[in-house]
Amino acid sequence: MKLRSVTYALFIAGLAAFSTSSLAAQSLRFGYETSQTDSQHIAAKKFNDLLQERTKGELKLKLFPDSTLGNAQAMISGVRGGTIDMEMSGSNNFAGLSPVMNLLDVPFLFRDTAHAHKTLDGKVGDDLKASLEGKGLKVLAYWENGWRDVTNSRAPVKTPADLKGLKIRTNNSPMNIAAFKVFGANPIPMPFAEVYTGLETRTIDAQEHPINVVWSAKFFEVQKFLSLTHHAYSPLLVVINKAKFDGLSPEFQQALVSSAQEAGNYQRKLVAEDQQKIIDGMKEAGVEVITDLDRKAFSDALGNQVRDMFVKDVPQGADLLKAVDEVQ
């Protein structure tokens, strides 16, 4: 009888040990391209804190900044294949999987930041998220890259004509590449991790990232001029492997989504708060900041050429553009 009791006690203890180990914290590998000084990394740490708080430490993130897990395309492939759990990158990187994502690279699409946020946080944003689910990706939230501006080492850019012949690094979006070709520039897509060296060696003259990225990546060290063109608003997508997400409990799923969204709102605020400090810092570093430019002249130079291209390439393109324009 004693032996049976001891055996039973050991069995129960073993079950408890197994249960405890099975509930040990799950770690999700989360990669992105920007540095540890960028708002993206700062907000990613908050995301992790919120997630652990809401899951009592049972679900957490392991952060991989600085392109540690590869460039955006490599990380997206990794997430789809299940070798990486999560990644964060610009919307342009998903257009090859879902052409509707090209909507977000149509220049001068949004009137202002509030219009961009309301669009992304509403039905249009939900429809774009849904377009990736069949590709093995679940979009948890939209974070902020920001308004794209032009820096270069050649001369001040004040008008569209000033872009003529400029070798400018662009992202891989067909919309963005087409826009700079219309301006007369020579757009050169290039992985983010190669941009600093490209600017330093004059392989390229210019680039067009939001200024918070220009600052954290130190592009200003190898550029002379910053023109606040605000030619496009660039969101970030925080994505997770769809099968991984579906395998989590409903409680963990909710914690993941709510934490990503709250951290995203925090990151948007960080970007807004940093703008003037970054501009001042660039001026102190010797960069000439051009604010007296006519953004309407840039928009007028494009006309509807890029919008028409989007409508031609995407069956529901006209409806999507109309939906964005109608957001108040």
From Swiss-Prot:
This is 2,3-diketo-L-gulonate-binding periplasmic protein YiaO. The keyword Signal applies. GO terms for molecular function: carbohydrate binding. It is found in: Periplasm. Transmembrane segments: none annotated. Gene3D superfamilies: Bacterial extracellular solute-binding protein, family 7. Residues 1-24 form the signal peptide. The complex comprises the extracytoplasmic solute receptor protein YiaO, and the two transmembrane proteins YiaM and YiaN. Part of the tripartite ATP-independent periplasmic (TRAP) transport system YiaMNO involved in the uptake of 2,3-diketo-L-gulonate. This protein specifically binds 2,3-diketo-L-gulonate. Is not able to bind either L-ascorbate or dehydroascorbate. One of its GO terms (biological process) is DNA damage response.
